[in-house]
A protein has these predicted regions:
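Sequence/structural signature of beta-propeller modules
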Residues: 7, 14-150, 534-546
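Surface-exposed loop and turn segments in beta-propeller and other repeat-based domains
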Residues: 106, 110-153, 225-266, 307-369, ...
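Blade-loop segments of beta-propeller domains
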Residues: 145-172, 183-273
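Structural signature of eukaryotic scaffold interfaces centered on beta-propeller domains
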Residues: 152-176, 267-278, 366-386, 444-445, ...
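Residue-level signature of beta-propeller blades and closely related beta-rich strand-turn architectures
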Residues: 166, 185-186, 288, 297, ...
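Structural motif
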Residues: 189-218, 290-296, 396-411, 466-477, ...
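Short loop/turn segments immediately following beta-strands, especially the blade-tip
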Residues: 221-225, 295-333, 402-428, 474-483, ...
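Loop/turn-rich, solvent-exposed surfaces of beta-rich toroidal or solenoidal domains
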Residues: 385-500, 506
């Protein structure tokens, strides 16, 4: 047991498998609507960033005049970017909730977490065949997940960041771990519903633990040991018994009024298509809302003695349980984390202030004006540190834009996170993506899954269903007198299922700059699909584009 953490009188540690007593059963219910912030969260489309979503019958908002007909010629000219549309503001202040949770549970630093990484990966040639990669780019590093993560239908990897984003010198803690962090979203659940008679449907003996909407987990990879560890992201709240608790990340509670089934999804998760680790903060893209922010100094440890079969005492006099995979937060005076040892609570929300455009987004349609989508984010350290944020769009289904990108000074974002409710962070630049070029009988410049900006040039990862994606390059220029991104006519074949981008600049460790990404598709999705992390030498990428 962790020294110094002694249970209160009458709260002795118990075997992890012991069921809650009838006395405890009336206390601390399953999380519900009481956990949501006053201003709520908007839902994203179920098929967010899915190349196959939509029917091709999208419609535009009345406020936009551009054509919405599907097809290559629908967007003949780039749309201008409007930086004002990207403005963010700090939402409901939850610092008091985080303080209460901080006092209730023990914590673990990231350096120690890296030393206790428990899941082995494969590295370089041990990953086997490299069939998911195209012929244009030489892959420099490869990392393969443990088999259950490589094949999981529940968890789908999306976003990537690392220590090069976190610190200029790339030196985190006392180890040589040089952590890389990958976020994945829960793709397999109906979740629960407050409005159904069987609100506790996911707790039934017959229910799989995959029933719950677990939200987002982050996997921290130790490059020195090739081991990694999962951390579940959570949302702090006061439950109906006025006790501090936490729930998995989601947008809103569903409103199924009958039995909760897969066709009546109870909860709406978030996609986490992009992530930036900057200093102590982890920024996670929330497509419909903006960004969720987490603090790496607040990683809570539900199993500090590393003995899963024994409940550990917590500073608040209760115990924690990492065996039960169906429960989350404080329930019946026991702390749970869906079986995960580590949970990290959200500390702030940065929400878009601009109203949504009125057009449909069910098929990943995008629009030239109004609130953007936070589909992916990355960090540019070339000059003054900036976050780059962009949209995934599918013009085959309509809309009036192939996507927009904007940049924020990191100093403004940090000030908003640490400031009072309403503190804003404004984009200082915005562009619409290039148009005109074609690929596979459709527009080239859409279906963007990741972006990075490096030494003045922009690099985009374009997906292509269950086939090789493309790495694209664009340069700021002038088109018809307006400042816009001009696409390079050359494209580079990338991996199957390409996702977010992360640039490890190498200024601290002396290595050549690496452009990292990841593939999302499990082998069950297609014959050649495979999940890997991989990097290209950035110098070779630049040279290959000419």
């Amino acid at each position: 047991m962790l020294s110094g953490l002694v249970p209160a009188v009458g709260a002795a540690a118990a075997p992890a498998s012991a069921p809650p007593s009838s006395v405890r059963a009336a206390d601390d219910p399953a999380p519900g609507n009481e956990g949501m912030p006053d201003d709520g969260f908007d839902n994203e489309s179920e098929g967010e960033q899915d190349d196959f979503a939509g029917t091709g019958t999208g419609s535009a908002a009345a406020s936009d005049s551009a054509s919405t007909a599907p097809g290559v010629s629908a967007l003949a000219a780039p749309v201008p970017g409007r930086a004002a549309d990207f403005k963010l503001a700090k939402s409901t202040d939850i610092s008091g909730l985080v303080t209460k949770l901080d006092a209730a549970l023990p914590k673990q630093g990231l350096t120690e977490l890296m030393e206790q990484a428990n899941r082995p990966s494969k590295w370089e040639g041990a990953c086997g065949t490299a069939g998911i990669y195209g012929s244009d780019l030489a892959v420099n590093h490869r990392v393969c997940w443990q088999s259950d993560d490589a094949t999981s239908s529940e968890w789908v990897p999306q976003a990537i960041t690392g220590v090069s984003d976190a610190q200029e010198d790339e030196d985190w803690g006392t180890s040589n771990a040089e952590p890389i962090a990958v976020a994945g979203y829960d793709a397999e659940n109906p979740g629960r519903s407050n409005y159904a008679k069987d609100r506790d449907n996911c707790l039934q003996d017959s229910a799989s633990d995959a029933c719950n909407e677990k939200g987002i987990r982050v996997s921290f990879f130790n490059q020195a040991t090739q081991m990694y560890r999962h951390v579940l992201l959570v949302w702090p709240y006061m439950n109906s018994k006025d006790h501090i608790s936490f729930d998995a990340l989601h947008a809103s509670e569903g409103k199924c009024t009958t039995e909760v089934t897969s066709s009546c999804a109870a909860q709406n998760g978030i996609h986490a298509g992009g992530m930036v680790w900057y200093g102590n903060y982890l920024y996670v893209a929330d497509t419909a809302n903006g960004m969720r922010v987490f603090d790496l100094r607040k990683i809570m440890d539900l199993n500090p003695d590393n003995k899963a079969d024994v409940d550990d005492p917590t500073p608040d006099g209760l115990v924690s349980n990492v065996v039960d995979k169906k429960r989350i937060g404080r329930q019946s005076n026991v702390w749970y984390g869906y079986g995960y040892r580590y949970v990290m609570p959200q500390v702030a929300t940065l929400k878009f202030t601009t109203a949504k455009n009125g057009g449909t987004t069910s098929g990943n349609q995008c629009y030239a004006t109004g609130r953007p989508k936070a589909s992916y984010i990355s960090l540019d350290r070339t000059d003054t540190d900036h976050m780059v944020l962009g949209e995934y769009c599918n013009t085959n289904n309509g809309g009036t834009s192939p996507g927009r990108v904007g940049t924020y000074p990191m100093a403004e974002l940090t000030a908003a996170v640490e400031g009072a409710t309403g503190t804003t962070a404004s984009a200082d630049l915005a562009y619409g993506l290039p148009t005109g070029a074609t690929f596979n009988n459709e527009a080239l410049w859409h279906k963007i899954q990741g972006v990075t900006r490096y030494e003045g040039k922009w690099y985009f990862h374009r997906s292509n269903g269950y086939d090789n994606g493309r790495l694209l390059q664009a340069t700021p220029g002038t088109v018809d007198g307006a400042s816009q991104l001009v696409g390079n006519a050359k494209t580079l074949e990338s991996a199957f299922g390409p996702e977010d981008l992360y640039l490890a600049h190498g200024r601290g460790d002396g290595f050549a700059p690496q452009l990292w990404s990841l593939s999302e598709h499990a082998p069950s999705k297609c014959g050649s699909c495979k999940r890997e992390l991989y990097s290209y030498n950035m110098g070779e990428v630049i040279s290959d584009f000419g």
